[in-house]
Amino acid sequence: MQRTQIVDALAATAPQPVIRLCGWVRTRRDAKGFSFLEINDGSCLANIQAIVDEGIPAYANIGAVSTGAAVDITGELVESPGKGQKWEVRVQTLTLLGAADAETYPLQKKRHSDEFLRSIAHLRARTNKYGAAFRIRSEAAFAIHEFYRERGFFYVHTPILTGSDCEGAGEMFRVTTLPVEGSPTPASGNRYENDFFGKECNLTVSGQLEAETLALGLGKVYTFGPTFRAENSNTPRHAAEFWMIEPEVAFADLEEDMNLAEDMTRTVVRRILDRCAADLDLFNRFVDTTLVERLRQIADEPFARCSYTEAIELLLKSGKKFEYPVSFGLDLQTEHERYLAEEHFGKPVIVYNYPKEIKAFYMRLNDDGRTVAAMDVLVPRIGELIGGSQREERLDVLEARINEMGQNLEDYWWYLDLRRFGSVPHAGFGMGFERLLMLLTGITNIRDVIPFPRTPGNLEF
């Protein structure tokens, strides 16, 4: 008999004489002559109650059906007299698929700390909180693909292994097939001729540069994949491996870039509100009681916008004491970003036209010679959600910027070729997917919105 998911069983419009369900037992309560099982299969937040009568043969082994055990049941789907549940199952057959030792099973019927659950990341998807987080993660990923497909973008795949440093920061993971004792070092002159590729190879920090090449042939593209940063930052906002959404659009300027970033954010938020109501309600009750209200505001209201210069003036006039200094030419820190989004504007804000010294070489130099056509989307409780820019399309200006940043022109010969052959204005941005999920769930630690977090000193699973 075909299995029915619990989410579909609970949505039934009429009783069913026989139904088959599989899942994991959340709780078992024994009464005289029968037992109540709460079963969840991960398809939704809600459990379904199964009533096992002592008259069925499998009842003799009901003691082995403990919390965490996997079961396969068939029975009659009937209206439930219990409060808060529409349907329940009167079990006819029960098969224990996999037992779970009640003494050693880590997930008991109590609220576990996030720190503890990170140590058993292979099991935490069975909890209410993390099951909800990962369902929202799945729905958000689908909504992103849906958003770009509806707008005529092509989904492209950019390399994980790269010989380029998009950010110019050098905080990259090196990939080598050489033994440790044979690895290139400064003392050996960084000779890579014996390595697999014959040159230095790293894990990508961004697919942007490669996506630009595809946009300048396909028009509108986006990437959605893992990126890697070897930053030794043990903060709630940083991870060594995370996912990025990076659109690139030919013939677009900074204004179009900002419009796309806002449209994408608001559309995804709107779809999560529509499609994940039960899971969002869990986070709204137990993680952040203002979550749904804030998400509705993001979905309904246009974002604020201000230049970097205006942002600095607002921070200086705020009267607040910040830990980090505020001055033109200094990058905005998280505390500054959150003040602007949470306290001054009270909603997301797009800050644009940053000083060229604090932004990457590929961002278009503005006519003032001091700023670049860059933008960041700042949101409450998170800070920076998106960073983007109009890209520098002028060959001479780009070469000068690469030299200013101390980068090697030869490493970017192919990127410069785009400016030699039919160069056009173009723009794009990067959104950290995990930061979007923190916004959508109210979860404050990036380790809790990715199934297997990779952070300094942590490579379990």
Curated annotation (Swiss-Prot):
<dbReference type="InterPro" id="IPR045864">
    <property type="entry name" value="aa-tRNA-synth_II/BPL/LPL"/>
</dbReference>
<protein>
    <recommendedName>
        <fullName>Asparagine--tRNA ligase</fullName>
        <ecNumber>6.1.1.22</ecNumber>
    </recommendedName>
</protein>
<dbReference type="GO" id="GO:0005524">
    <property type="term" value="F:ATP binding"/>
</dbReference>
<dbReference type="InterPro" id="IPR002312">
    <property type="entry name" value="Asp/Asn-tRNA-synth_IIb"/>
</dbReference>
<dbReference type="InterPro" id="IPR004365">
    <property type="entry name" value="NA-bd_OB_tRNA"/>
</dbReference>
<keyword id="KW-0547">Nucleotide-binding</keyword>
<dbReference type="GO" id="GO:0004816">
    <property type="term" value="F:asparagine-tRNA ligase activity"/>
</dbReference>
<dbReference type="InterPro" id="IPR004364">
    <property type="entry name" value="Aa-tRNA-synt_II"/>
</dbReference>
<dbReference type="GO" id="GO:0005737">
    <property type="term" value="C:cytoplasm"/>
</dbReference>
<dbReference type="Pfam" id="PF01336">
    <property type="entry name" value="tRNA_anti-codon"/>
</dbReference>
<comment type="similarity">
    <text>Belongs to the class-II aminoacyl-tRNA synthetase family.</text>
</comment>
<dbReference type="InterPro" id="IPR006195">
    <property type="entry name" value="aa-tRNA-synth_II"/>
</dbReference>
<dbReference type="Pfam" id="PF00152">
    <property type="entry name" value="tRNA-synt_2"/>
</dbReference>
<dbReference type="GO" id="GO:0006421">
    <property type="term" value="P:asparaginyl-tRNA aminoacylation"/>
</dbReference>
<keyword id="KW-0436">Ligase</keyword>
<keyword id="KW-0030">Aminoacyl-tRNA synthetase</keyword>
<keyword id="KW-0963">Cytoplasm</keyword>
<dbReference type="InterPro" id="IPR012340">
    <property type="entry name" value="NA-bd_OB-fold"/>
</dbReference>
<dbReference type="GO" id="GO:0003676">
    <property type="term" value="F:nucleic acid binding"/>
</dbReference>
<keyword id="KW-0067">ATP-binding</keyword>
<comment type="subunit">
    <text>Homodimer.</text>
</comment>
<keyword id="KW-0648">Protein biosynthesis</keyword>
<dbReference type="InterPro" id="IPR004522">
    <property type="entry name" value="Asn-tRNA-ligase"/>
</dbReference>
